[in-house]
Amino acid sequence: MRQGDIAAAQAALAAAKDVSAGLSEREASHIGFFDLVFAGRTEAAIAALYPHLAAWPRDALVVSVAANPNGVIGGSGRIGQKHQIAEMMDNLASHYGDDFWFTSYHAMALSEDGQLAAARAKIEQSVAANPNNAHGAHGFAHVCYESGDPDTARAFLSSWLATYPRDGFFYGHLSWHLSLCEIQAGN
């Protein structure tokens, strides 16, 4: 899904639905959520999201689709959507501890909600735990830039991108962020 191969994602969902007899409640709920997302039934997907995460808060695939700023909540058009994502991540945090992946997503949610100081602490924690995490690098660039510290974002991204594969998923996007910082610096 993340790679933009909609047909493959739809085929995987169809295959999952074909073998859904006898699945656990968790698996059925997971498939049901994604069925609603893929069908474009955003409000129904959001309604299914919260009970699913209440029962299975560590379903990281569902969390990632819900927490992404352009995901099911962020792309819903709802008023207050950024705050809803930050609140959801706050509520899930105790289930993830110091997990670098979750912490990077939580930091982005806080940043998008304007909670920049809290976001900075979390993104620094995430990057320290796994300096190779591209989502963490992305979050660090966002938080620094939005906090009025583009020089730190620029220095970080210049160094970080030097070792990241040019065909890596985030390479183009992080290069764009670096370009914004360069423009801000007058370059």
Regions inferred by a protein language model and the residue ranges of each:
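Long, internal scaffold/assembly segments composed of regular secondary structure
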Residues: 142-187
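Short coil turns that delineate tetratricopeptide repeat
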Residues: 21-23, 57-58, 97, 131, ...
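Inter-helical turn/loop elements of alpha-helical hairpins
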Residues: 1-43, 70-82, 148-150, 186
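Canonical positions in the second alpha-helix
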Residues: 16, 51-52, 91-92, 125-126, ...
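Residue at a conserved register position within TPR or TPR-like alpha-solenoid repeats
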Residues: 36, 70-73, 110, 144, ...
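"A position-specific structural signal for the A-helix of alpha-solenoid helical repeats
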Residues: 31-35, 65, 105, 139-142, ...
